[in-house]
């Protein structure tokens, strides 16, 4: 029997792992043990990619093998999340609903970092008395953190005139400080805080409740979308105090008709597209020498797995791109572009293929 080469062995193991990862996306389980399993698979996936690069292998299953330092960093992050979830699974919160979005890396790193967070509402802060100079921040419904004694505890965030905070081990911990934000976005060192339809003055404080809560899925999408928002788009974000981040570099303009608690607009602003996500995903709104396409947008790891699995549906599409992203956008979020010979073929594809809930679908047309 012929012995497998290192590349063949690693390719086989990677394929099996990525099939299991995609199963997690498709099943969309809501128990904590499933999320622990998911992050273990992500760790093993990056361990394989790390090993491949050590052997000088630059491609596995048509997938580019990233540099060693990237695979190492991703593996360490996966271990961090896996260990945190294992600890949480031993707490009294283990029977709560835990989804991939609740335990994703983006929310874990969002302030307050190294905490799990669920739900959230928006607090609007207006600088210089100017309604057009507004920034928005998340007041989390639930923050899960490790106490000084190593026990997982749960609390709700509160908002005061001075910032957004939570009580940790009896101490007030601010994860957004409005004075620091005012130094970045204002000129007169004055600001107004509006939360839940109320204006909060220097002596007031309000805590998060269950009314008008934004889900973790919506928050993640808003965090992903924030880096591409224009100044007229009010995005939900929680920038670190004293640190400027690309997602919140410029003040947003806030209008009375803006929807802060609804699903984020998933339009991909691409001159090649004539339509995008809408109530009628398959409605053609342009004409000319175009071909039907869809954009699949989501986490790069899930897209790589999805691209691999789509090979068995090759009869239902014409071409599929590698994973790509817009310059300046969130590097963890990618896009796959799939082209079709006709609208009929595209409709069949959408009927036959199961797309994970974590992947956004944008339907359109592209000039050839």
Swiss-Prot record:
Gene3D superfamilies linked: 3.30.70.330, E2 (early) protein, N terminal domain, subdomain 1, Papillomavirus E2 early protein domain
UniProt-annotated location(s): Host nucleus
GO molecular function, one term: nucleotide binding
Region (Disordered): 227-251
Signal peptide (UniProt feature, chain positions): none
The entry's keywords: Activator, DNA replication, DNA-binding, Early protein, Host nucleus, Isopeptide bond, Phosphoprotein, Repressor, Transcription, Transcription regulation, Ubl conjugation
Biased composition, class Polar residues, residue ranges: 227-236
Protein biosynthesis in keyword set: no
Record PTM text: Phosphorylated.
Principal location: host cell
Stretches the record annotates as Transactivation domain: 1-207
GO CC term (a single one): host cell nucleus
Highest taxon of source: Viruses
GO biological process: DNA replication; DNA-templated transcription; regulation of DNA replication; viral DNA genome replication
Cross-link Glycyl lysine isopeptide (Lys-Gly) (interchain with G-Cter in SUMO), where in sequence: 297
InterPro entries assigned: E2/EBNA1_C_sf, Nucleotide-bd_a/b_plait_sf, Papillomavirus_E2_C, PPV_E2_N, Reg_prot_E2, Regulatory_protein_E2_N, Regulatory_protein_E2_N_1, Regulatory_protein_E2_N_2
Location of region: DNA-binding domain: 290-368
Family membership noted in the UniProt record: Belongs to the papillomaviridae E2 protein family.
Function recorded in the entry: Plays a role in the initiation of viral DNA replication. A dimer of E2 interacts with a dimer of E1 in order to improve specificity of E1 DNA binding activity. Once the complex recognizes and binds DNA at specific sites, the E2 dimer is removed from DNA. E2 also regulates viral transcription through binding to the E2RE response element (5'-ACCNNNNNNGGT-3') present in multiple copies in the regulatory regions of the viral genome. Activates or represses transcription depending on E2RE's position with regards to proximal promoter elements including the TATA-box.
Assembly, per entry: Binds DNA as homodimer. Interacts with protein E1; this interaction greatly increases E1 DNA-binding activity. Interacts with protein L1; this interaction enhances E2-dependent replication and transcription activation. Interacts with protein L2; this interaction inhibits E2 transcriptional activity but not DNA replication function E2. Interacts with protein E7; this interaction inhibits E7 oncogenic activity. Interacts with host TAF1; this interaction modulates E2-dependent transcriptional regulation. Interacts with host BRD4; this interaction mediates E2 transcriptional activation function.
The name this protein goes by in its record: Regulatory protein E2
Organism: Human papillomavirus 45
């Amino acid at each position: 029997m012929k012995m497998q080469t290192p590349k063949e062995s690693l390719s086989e193991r990677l394929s099996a792992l990525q099939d299991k990862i995609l199963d997690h996306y498709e099943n969309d389980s809501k128990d904590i043990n499933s999320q622990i399993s998911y992050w273990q698979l992500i760790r093993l996936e990056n361990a394989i990619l790390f090993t491949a690069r050590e052997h000088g292998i630059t491609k596995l299953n048509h997938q580019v093998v990233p540099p060693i330092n990237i695979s190492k960093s991703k593996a360490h992050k996966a271990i961090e999340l896996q260990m945190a979830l294992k600890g949480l699974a031993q707490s009294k919160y283990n029977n709560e609903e835990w989804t991939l979005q609740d335990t994703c890396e983006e929310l874990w790193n969002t302030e307050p970092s190294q905490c799990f967070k669920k739900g959230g509402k928006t607090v609007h802060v207006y600088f210089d008395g100017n309604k057009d100079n507004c920034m928005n921040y998340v007041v989390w419904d639930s923050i899960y953190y490790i106490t000084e004694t190593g026990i997982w505890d749960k609390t709700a965030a509160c908002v005061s005139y001075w910032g957004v905070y939570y009580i940790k081990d009896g101490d007030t911990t601010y994860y957004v400080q409005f004075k620091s934000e005012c130094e970045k976005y204002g000129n007169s060192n004055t600001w107004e805080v509006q939360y839940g339809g109320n204006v909060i003055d220097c002596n007031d404080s309000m805590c998060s409740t269950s009314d008008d809560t934004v889900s973790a899925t919506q928050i993640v999408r808003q965090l992903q979308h924030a880096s591409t928002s224009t100044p007229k788009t009010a995005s939900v974000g929680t920038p670190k105090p004293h640190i400027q981040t690309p997602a919140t570099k410029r003040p947003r303009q806030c209008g009375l008709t803006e929807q802060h608690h609804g699903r984020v607009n998933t339009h991909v602003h691409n001159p090649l597209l004539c339509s995008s996500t809408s109530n009628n995903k398959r409605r053609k709104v342009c004409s000319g020498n175009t071909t039907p396409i869809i954009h699949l947008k989501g986490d790069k790891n899930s897209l790589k797995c999805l691209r691999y699995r789509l090979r068995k549906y090759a009869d239902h599409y014409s071409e599929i791109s590698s994973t790509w992203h817009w310059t300046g956008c969130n590097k963890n979020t990618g896009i796959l572009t799939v082209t079709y010979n006709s609208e009929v073929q595209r409709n069949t594809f959408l009927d036959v293929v199961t797309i994970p809930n974590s992947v956004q679908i944008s339907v359109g047309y592209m000039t050839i």
